[in-house]
Amino acid sequence: GRETLERVYADCFGAEDALVRPQITCGTHALALALMSNLRPGDELLSPVGKPYDTLEEVIGIRPSKGSLAEYGITYAQVDLLPDGEFDYDGIKKAINEKTKLVTIQRSKGYATRPTLSVKRIGELIAFVKSIKPDVICMVDNCYGEFVEDTEPIQVGADMMVGSLIKNPGGGLAPIGGYIVGKKECVENAAYRLTSPGLGKEVGASLGVIQSFYQGFFLAPTVVSGALKGAIFAAKIYEKLGFKVVPDGTESRHDIIQAV
């Protein structure tokens, strides 16, 4: 059942707890759930890796939207990567203040052309942030990155990791769903936000999709491996045709995204 599935997710990703539900409809929904459940009015959200996905702009309130974090009095700060793709450590240090409650780190390049972050680099960034403010929550948007490397962000210090089952961990079989893994308190907060205070993870029909969640998760490493091989193959072909590709056919890969 769902309880065992969540224990499997927590164990595989090295987390204390997990929330894996079909009621989480997509990656953006999972991220919104994680943010809204762990931030309160007066808190500040910091992105030390530049602008997040376009879909998160309305969640945060960068673009005005009903129900955004901004509407609830949660502020947002952003530190862009340096031109060479490195972290702006000085800028990050200046941006962290007494209001900074949660730091969100987007692993994948997504729809941009900036470098995807390796788990090692994510760990270095988390260690730096924690050295300045140890109690800050470090959340990693792990979309497109699961099973690409042999370690995951939780194993290098992330307090919370979020992703979508219609990407890597669903193995192409999960028709819907998202996950949040990490510290027990963070996951519990998300569960109470998903359903209701006092109910949390105890309710919510699985609607017959649990088998596809298990099978997809079992197949996910193989499916991700195939996606990486296809991306490398496509990169080499388009390079030979004269196109600019990011990453190129020889670079180390930390997600399944290929830009042409």
Task: Identify the residue ranges that each predicted region occupies.
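Conserved N-terminal alpha-helix of the aminotransferase class I/II PLP-enzyme fold
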Residues: 1-27, 62
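Short, solvent-exposed coil/turn segments
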Residues: 14-15, 72, 253
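Conserved PLP-enzyme active-site core in the AAT-like
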Residues: 25-225, 229, 235-238, 244-246
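Conserved glycine-rich beta-strand-loop-beta hairpin in the small C-terminal domain of fold type I
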Residues: 250-258
